[in-house]
């Protein structure tokens, strides 16, 4: 997501159309109806679903969270404008891998250019009171991430390659 228009699209897509007199009308909802399955999954009536199936923080009762990813220099350059002009963004998640690649330092998360870019994203988010997300929180960096002010934390799933390793061994490709 690199500009105002591309960032407004997911918010519009998550919202049902509302009367123009409704509070927080913009961005206008583009979502189709069909609430039956979703209401059943949520364990609520259709009318309750309509009330809850809106974007937080636009609708304080909304239970949908729109997270945009900031993973290239162009996005950083436009981030302040995006956060000023696009209501409803709940979190800005830094795409560390793609960002480091875009800067020319693939997976070198400690490179000064990558650190500087991530700091700029956090600062802009803080200025606009939008939580900034860190995608790679682990025991060794948890305290640093919290101290730096990240408010949305993600951890990688535990992965096991036992079957792959066994197959490689069986095929002599270890």
Language model features: what each stretch is:
Residues 2-9:
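Short, small-residue-biased leader/transition segments that mark boundaries at the very start
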Residues 10, 121:
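Aromatic/hydrophobic pocket-lining residues that form π-stacking "cages" and hydrophobic walls in ligand
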Residues 149:
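Conserved functional loop/turn residues at catalytic and ligand-binding sites
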């Amino acid at each position: 997501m690199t500009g105002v228009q591309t960032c407004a699209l997911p918010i519009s897509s998550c919202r049902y159309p509302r009367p123009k007199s409704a509070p927080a009308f913009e961005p206008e909802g583009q979502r189709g109806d069909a609430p039956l399955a979703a209401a059943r999954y949520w364990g609520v009536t259709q009318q309750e679903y309509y009330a809850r199936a809106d974007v937080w923080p636009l609708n304080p009762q909304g239970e949908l969270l729109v997270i945009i990813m900031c993973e290239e220099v162009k996005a950083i350059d436009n981030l302040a404008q995006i956060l000023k002009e696009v209501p409803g963004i709940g979190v800005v998640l830094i795409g560390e891998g793609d960002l480091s690649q875009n800067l020319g330092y693939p997976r070198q998360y400690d490179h000064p250019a990558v650190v500087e870019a991530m700091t700029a994203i956090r600062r802009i988010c803080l200025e606009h009171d939008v939580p900034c997300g860190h995608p790679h929180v682990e025991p060794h960096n948890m305290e640093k991430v919290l101290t730096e002010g990240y408010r949305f934390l993600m951890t990688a799933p535990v992965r096991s390659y036992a079957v792959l390793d066994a197959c490689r061994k069986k095929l002599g490709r270890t």
